């Protein structure tokens, strides 16, 4: 039986989330809802407690959204690095101290470096590591690159 486009895309994203959660976060991150949504000017985003859980009036789940407009124009490693970038936001929300909405603080930047992504407002070496609108680049031979190579 052929896999549907929905099953293939969401299954791949969920498999990647599970792999990087184990490899980079020691399996500490909770399950979340991964969505595919267009969001102008962003490769992805994180939203805490975004959706109610089916069958519960009080429980919520966090969302990691990936922008499909950028899937074809970037390498699989770059796309997966966006997923991990958003996973760092989830980590900070659950285990750290977030700053104001959309601000990427020093704690976030330190965790990014720990998982093998270098924060940069330009997406290249030499950029600011904290701020409102942030990107990153992949650390050569860092934890993310090693985990990506075995995925």
Model-derived segments and spans:
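Active-site recognition of the HExxH zinc-binding catalytic motif
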Residues: 81-94
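Metalloprotease/metallohydrolase-associated module, dominated by Zn2+-dependent proteases
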Residues: 2-74, 94-151
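Glycine-rich, basic loop-to-helix element that forms the pyrophosphate-binding segment
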Residues: 78
């Amino acid at each position: 039986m052929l896999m549907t486009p929905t099953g293939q895309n969401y299954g791949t994203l969920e498999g990647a989330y599970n792999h990087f959660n184990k490899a980079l976060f020691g399996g500490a991150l909770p399950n979340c809802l991964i969505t595919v949504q267009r969001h102008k000017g962003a490769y992805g985003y994180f939203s805490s407690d975004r959706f109610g859980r089916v069958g519960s009036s009080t429980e919520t789940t966090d969302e990691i959204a990936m922008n499909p407009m950028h899937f074809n124009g970037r390498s699989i490693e770059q796309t997966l690095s966006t997923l991990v970038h958003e996973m760092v936001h989830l980590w900070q929300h659950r285990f750290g101290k977030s700053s104001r909405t959309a601000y990427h603080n020093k704690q976030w930047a330190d965790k990014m470096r720990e998982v093998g992504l270098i924060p940069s407002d330009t997406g290249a070496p030499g950029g600011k590591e904290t701020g409102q609108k942030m990107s990153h680049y992949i650390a050569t031979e860092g934890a993310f690159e090693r985990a990506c190579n075995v995925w």
